[in-house]
């Protein structure tokens, strides 16, 4: 069994993953080989919502390796802090952000996020009290924050259990590989298959991605 570590995971002391995989296997026996091949830990929450959304923007449409390097260099700008607050970010010159590898659109997007967090500070502190759909509706009001970015926030920050980002390319590739499809599945095809995985679709977003690393 290959054990894969995602960002923001912890040892599954409470058995969340075990419970989820048992349910998923009962709902979809074809997943047996996947669960025998891959082992993942439980998700752990991220308390800094601003950091989480900025990170997802940096990772948009980039490989994990490339995005990780850019995000590391970005954080080094603010060496005295573990992560800048929205005001610090807005004070940072465009050229400084550009120098670490951020594109101009992404610089504008994270500035939009910073401005929105300043304006809606109290509202955003209570995001976890909202439903998944309410959070998507609220955060996608920010220019540059699309459904995928919010889905990453729901999964890796709030640890919501039933998120399935059908537009994620790595997930689509893993889905194609595991189910031995000739072509990349459409978002509709993935959504139809994923119906049987409710209410644990988040974990079925992680397993296929891990599977691609083994092939």
Feature map (PLM): residue ranges:
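Catalytic DNA-binding helix-loop module of base-excision-repair DNA glycosylases/AP lyases
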Residues: 58, 131-176
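Active-site-proximal or metal-binding-adjacent scaffold patches in catalytic folds
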Residues: 11-44, 133
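Short, aromatic/basic-rich helix-turn unit that serves as a nucleic-acid recognition element
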Residues: 53, 57, 61
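Alpha-helical ds-nucleic-acid-binding substructure associated with the helix-hairpin-helix region
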Residues: 30, 34, 63, 67-141, ...
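Short, charged, surface-exposed loops that flank catalytic or proteolytic processing sites
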Residues: 181-187
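N-terminal amphipathic/basic-hydrophobic helices that include classical n-h-c signal peptides
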Residues: 1-9
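Conserved small/polar residues in nucleotide/adenosyl-binding loops
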Residues: 212-215
């Amino acid at each position: 069994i290959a054990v894969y570590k995602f960002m923001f995971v912890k040892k599954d002391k409470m058995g969340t993953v075990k419970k989820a995989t048992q349910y998923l296997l009962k709902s979809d026996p074809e997943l047996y080989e996947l669960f025998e091949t891959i082992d993942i830990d439980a998700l752990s929450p991220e308390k800094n919502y601003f950091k989480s959304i900025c990170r997802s923007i940096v990772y948009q449409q980039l490989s994990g390796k490339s995005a990780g390097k850019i995000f590391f260099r970005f954080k080094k700008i603010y060496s005295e802090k573990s992560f800048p607050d929205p005001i610090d970010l807005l004070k940072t010159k465009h050229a400084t952000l550009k120098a670490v590898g951020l594109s101009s659109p992404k610089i504008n997007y994270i500035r939009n996020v910073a401005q929105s967090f300043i304006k809606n500070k109290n509202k955003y502190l209570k995001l976890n009290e909202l439903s998944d759909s309410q959070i998507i509706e609220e955060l996608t009001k920010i220019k540059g924050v699309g459904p995928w970015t919010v889905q990453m926030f729901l999964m890796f920050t709030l640890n919501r259990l039933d998120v399935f980002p059908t537009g994620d390319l790595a997930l689509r590739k893993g889905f194609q590989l595991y189910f031995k499809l000739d072509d990349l599945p459409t978002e509709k095809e993935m959504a139809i298959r994923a119906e049987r995985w409710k209410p644990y679709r988040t974990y079925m977003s992680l397993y296929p991605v891990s599977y691609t690393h083994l092939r």
